[in-house]
């Protein structure tokens, strides 16, 4: 998941954004200016890809299908299999749900734009997309933090694990993750929503990205930028430090274990550690790509789009490959549907 509270675009983005007019109130883009200002935005980040357009469409479509299918399977087995009672699967259920909704805020709209060449979005729709994309991204990091704490309790306090991770504590941790995300997201998006938009309405990105939309404001946004960066740092530092602390304590505890116990403990947190590394690594790569001059404007946007879907795409694959209980649960689920499919096929043949 890509955390986009940061303004990751270059300081002088002449190649990425159209220059704003000096008099926003007297300018008009495609005749959309009305007395009350801009009523919709035009998403133009992915409209000039020529032959790469269809390739990106196929990649996004297949990736989105896998994201929906893989995460839906995890949600189904985690909520219906009585053998998956560990709090870890409850948190994984919530992470998969967040991943599905997170990608749904942007990918369907982009796919529709590829097919129809209609890239407009209403002003309320733009800000709803912006808010939920950022909020769900932060929620994903917060849930990964909760899962790191869960692994810490399971490895460092195994005898007290069930007493600590009660149902009420699980719900409280998930509610805290959502509340933390809302707290970090709402100030920046609400400030951007209240700003005047009375001139250019072309968003140079694949979706209504916060920094891209804010460049269209016909007012001073220095305070907005400070607020956005402050809450972005808060979100990244809080989740990053807590995850790092959990794994440092896990590592210290593993040093006191025997080889067999150490391997077993590492196996229980390997999938989560892999997902965390990919999440922060992909966000860092996107940030760096906007600071390197070798990337063209279109390439930067493509990188941002693809990496925003990378973690939701890989999550179900990683957890399915690294978790034997989840693998067995998926096999049991598929075996329940297989006899019904065979019977239905026989009825058709007869």
Where are these regions (language model features)?
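Transmembrane helical core of 7TM receptor-like proteins
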Residues: 1-350
């Amino acid at each position: 998941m890509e955390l986009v509270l940061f303004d990751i675009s270059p300081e002088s983005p002449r190649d990425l954004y159209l220059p704003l007019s000096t008099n926003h109130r007297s300018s008009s883009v495609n005749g959309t200016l009305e007395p009350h200002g801009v009523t919709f935005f035009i998403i133009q980040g992915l409209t000039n890809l020529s032959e790469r357009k269809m390739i990106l469409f196929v990649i996004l479509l297949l990736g989105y299908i896998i994201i929906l299918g893989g995460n839906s399977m995890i949600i189904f087995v985690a909520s219906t299999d009585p053998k998956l009672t560990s709090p870890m699967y409850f948190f994984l259920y919530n992470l998969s749900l967040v991943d599905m909704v997170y990608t749904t805020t942007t990918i369907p709209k982009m796919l529709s734009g590829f097919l129809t060449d209609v890239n407009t979005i209403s002003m309320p729709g733009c800000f709803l997309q912006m808010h939920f994309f950022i909020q769900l991204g932060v929620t994903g990091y917060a849930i990964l933090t909760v899962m790191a704490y869960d692994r810490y309790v399971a490895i460092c306090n195994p005898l007290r694990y069930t007493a600590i991770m009660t149902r009420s504590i699980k719900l409280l941790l998930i509610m805290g993750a959502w509340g933390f995300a809302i707290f970090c997201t709402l100030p920046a998006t609400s400030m951007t929503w209240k700003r005047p938009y009375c001139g250019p309405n072309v968003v140079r990105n694949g979706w209504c990205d916060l920094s891209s939309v804010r460049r269209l404001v016909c007012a001073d946004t220095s305070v907005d930028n400070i607020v956005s960066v402050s809450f972005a740092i808060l979100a990244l530092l809080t989740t990053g430090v807590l995850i790092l602390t959990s794994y440092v304590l896990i590592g210290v505890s593993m040093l006191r274990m025997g080889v067999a116990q150490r391997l077993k403990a590492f196996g229980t947190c390997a999938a989560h550690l892999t997902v965390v590394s990919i999440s922060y690594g992909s966000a860092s790569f996107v940030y760096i790509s906007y600071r390197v001059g070798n990337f063209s404007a279109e390439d930067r946007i493509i990188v941002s789009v693809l990496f925003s879907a990378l973690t939701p795409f890989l999550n179900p694959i990683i957890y399915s490959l690294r978790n034997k209980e989840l693998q067995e649960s998926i096999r049991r689920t598929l075996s329940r549907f297989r006899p019904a499919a065979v019977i239905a096929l026989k009825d058709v043949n007869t």
